[in-house]
Amino acid sequence: MEQQQERPREVYRECMRNHAAKLGTYANDGCCEYTPDDGHPAGLLCAACGCHRNFHRKDFLDGRATAAAGGAGGAGVGVAPMLPAPGGGGPPGYMHMAAMGGAVGGGGGVDGGGGSGGRRRTRTKFTEEQKARMLRFAERLGWRMPKREPGRAPGDDEVARFCREIGVNRQVFKVWMHNHKAGGGGGGGGSGGPGAGGGAQTSSSTTRGGGDVGVGLSPAMGGDGEDDEEVRGSEMCM
């Protein structure tokens, strides 16, 4: 009489529960294998992640199941290789951190992020006194950022002192001056030359209805060593 074949033993691998389904993305909890909870043997809950056993990927410890799952059919008893989580490579824990950090906004929880996924650019608002003083100072400079004087320490030139007086960052003042030298702030018409060449040096300029201006500067604008780099991510309120 032939010996009755044993039933393949079932094992439960990584948790496949999607904790970010409401956000329209995929994020698991990083649990790599189902661990029975000895305190609730009949509940079938995982002691590691707290999810029901049905959320974990089921596998069989026999050659046929291994061949079907991983394509490495063997005659003996084997374990199927761990499949990557849907949506990308890497172990489940890495997928969990990537999805929670990118899609949720890095808030450390599903409900803690803003959901936008993008970084908002900063916006600077000026008082009327600041705008008036910057306009007069820019006209006196000829609407062009001057070079630093040789031998002077950084932050000891005329522009740095002016920025400290009015409480404005040097780079912010540079962007504001570039935005207004073409005539937008009334200073380009009176200064002549710099106003005429403003269009050639502007790489992008967008004016919105609320008066916000986002601008990028070409490296040729300033003769200053530190101020020659391209300015990105700055917005001004008129």
UniProtKB/Swiss-Prot annotation:
Subunit: Homo- and heterodimer with other ZFHD proteins.
Asked whether the UniProt record includes Zinc among its keywords, one would answer yes
A Pfam family annotated for this UniProt entry: ZF-HD_dimer
Query: How are the domains described in the entry?
Result: The homeodomain differs form the typical one by having namely 4 instead of 3 extra amino acids inserted in the loop between helix 1 and helix 2.
This chain's source organism reads: Oryza sativa subsp. indica (Rice)
Query: Region Disordered: which residues?
Result: 183-238
Domain of life, per lineage: Eukaryota
GO annotation, biological process: regulation of developmental process
The UniProt entry lists the main location of this chain as nucleus
Residues in the DNA-binding region annotation: 119-188
- The name this protein carries in UniProt is Zinc-finger homeodomain protein 11
